[in-house]
């Protein structure tokens, strides 16, 4: 959502699917997470997925492994990134997380994962029926986050 918002600010383009995603409350997802016994959760906002995941892992004393191919993106996010619509906050997020990160993905993928969000959904530790599984939490390792 962040790169699409940056593109909107620069071009005036409207992205209805991004607006819909931002205005859809996380209530149903939160209810499902609680019902499924989620261990912890956070909403993905200004720190992006990587920043919020790093904070979650650090506070919980664990490390996280992300499967980059399993992470869903809104249509147009990669095109907005390719067009250079990246906020300074996204770059600062990545700079902040990078020392705690082991990644085998390219810089563009890292920027999307660090994308500063207005409303990026919930990151939940637990098994939620119907929710995408993007990784797992493991005992604390050398790095807080590993991306493959």
Task: Describe each model-derived feature in a short phrase.
Residues 1-34:
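Short, acidic (Asp/Glu-rich) active-site segment that either coordinates a divalent metal cofactor
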Residues 35-148:
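Glycine-/charge-enriched secondary-structure boundary and capping motifs
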């Amino acid at each position: 959502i962040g790169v699409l918002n940056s593109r909107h600010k620069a071009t005036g383009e409207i992205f209805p699917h991004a607006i819909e995603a931002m205005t859809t409350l996380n209530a149903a997802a939160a209810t499902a997470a609680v019902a499924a016994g989620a261990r912890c959760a956070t909403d993905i906002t200004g720190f992006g997925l990587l920043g919020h995941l790093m904070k979650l892992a650090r506070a919980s004393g664990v490390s996280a492994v992300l499967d980059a191919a399993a992470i869903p993106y809104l249509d147009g996010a990669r095109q907005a990134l390719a067009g250079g619509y990246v906020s300074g906050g996204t770059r600062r997020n990545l700079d902040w997380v990078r020392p705690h990160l082991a990644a085998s993905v390219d810089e563009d993928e890292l920027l999307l994962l660090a994308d500063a969000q207005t409303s990026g959904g919930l990151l939940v530790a637990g098994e939620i029926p119907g929710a995408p599984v993007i990784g797992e939490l493991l005992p604390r390792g050398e790095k807080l986050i590993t991306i493959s």
